[in-house]
Amino acid sequence: MHEMALCEGIVEIVEAEARKGAFSKVKTVWLEIGALSHVAPEALRFCFEAVTAHTIARGAALEIIEQKGSAWCLGCSRSVEISRRYDACSECGSHQLQVTGGEDMRVKELEVE
């Protein structure tokens, strides 16, 4: 389960921001997770609670904003939405797609005290 390691990375980011911003408690963490990122949101929620137990993010709410996948079709030169890497272009049916979005996971915002 790589979500545990991802949550540990999130805590590192939160703690680094706490040092920079001089806050002592995190109330909410907003994450953007791309549809093509291979991150399971429910597994991430479970791991987040365990990993944050003894940190400044203990008890913090985890809000997940799911981002759609997108790609550029080399066949018809259009930007299209995709939900899986092997999807066909919704405009022309081509499988010659170059992924342009939806692969990332990032901390978007923190609510702190």
Swiss-Prot record:
PROSITE patterns associated with the record: HYPA
Residue positions binding Zn(2+): C73, C76, C89, C92
Binding locations of Ni(2+): H2
GO BP field: protein maturation; protein modification process
GO molecular function: nickel cation binding; zinc ion binding
Domain of life: Bacteria
InterPro entries: Hydgase_Ni_incorp_HypA/HybF_CS, HypA/HybF
Keywords per UniProt: Metal-binding, Nickel, Zinc
Function, as annotated: Involved in the maturation of [NiFe] hydrogenases. Required for nickel insertion into the metal center of the hydrogenase.
Family: Belongs to the HypA/HybF family.
Name of the featured protein: Hydrogenase maturation factor HypA
Organism: Bradyrhizobium sp. (strain ORS 278)
